Amino acid sequence: IEGIEVLNIERDAGIVFATDEDIVVEDLADDVAEAPQDGGEEIAAAQDAPSPAQPASAPQAHVPDLDFTAADATRVLIAWWTKMRPDQLGAADSIESLCDGASSRRNQLLVDLGAELSLGAIDGAAEADMVTLASKTSAMARGYRPFGSVLSGTISDHLAKVLGPSGKRPAFIGERVRDVWQLGDGWVPHVTAHLAMATREGTSVRGGDFGPSASLAKADDVANAIDTAISEVALAQGLTVTMPQASSGEGATID
């Protein structure tokens, strides 16, 4: 019969059962046709892929970090003890003059200063002016790390009370300094101390408020107060920093 091909079931099993090599080759051809030629698509995809983003909290090199020294701690402790703002301490002031000759107050301040800096007694500290005392404490307490035993408790207790209504803890200060402003770790004790000093009740013995009288009842209030403290710390250091734009991924800038 013409048109009918007679096959041997053993010899031509591949054709009979549709497992012949022609089908396999056709499938491979389809795979090759669908695959990217010369790796073009893979290269394009690699070129289009976004580069890894830098961590938002990484401090930026163009903004200098700060160092909270023994001299800084001395100034903060004296200003806190004498109920003044740090900027109101004059170069000629001394612990003796600031305590108005009250030996009990003077002696307690000297004890606290020695404890904060882990120095014990500091010879001549009572009579030394602020410039001399700063130089002396910096030289004697080179290994100081903020905060010491006195300021850590004083500042922490005060901030816990002040920030309590907002639901924020003192650690929020460091988080905002590092993660939002992208400043170095050295800024944290400066901003923390500044915020604590500025939120004390009452007024300075040398006149004027300690800081803004705005309420810190909400989280946004606390954030704004921290931002203000950062700007004021920067100004005291002769710097001007700007909060980075949320979408830019860049760090705080300095003028």
Language model features with spans:
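4′-phosphopantetheine-dependent carrier domains
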Residues: I1-D255
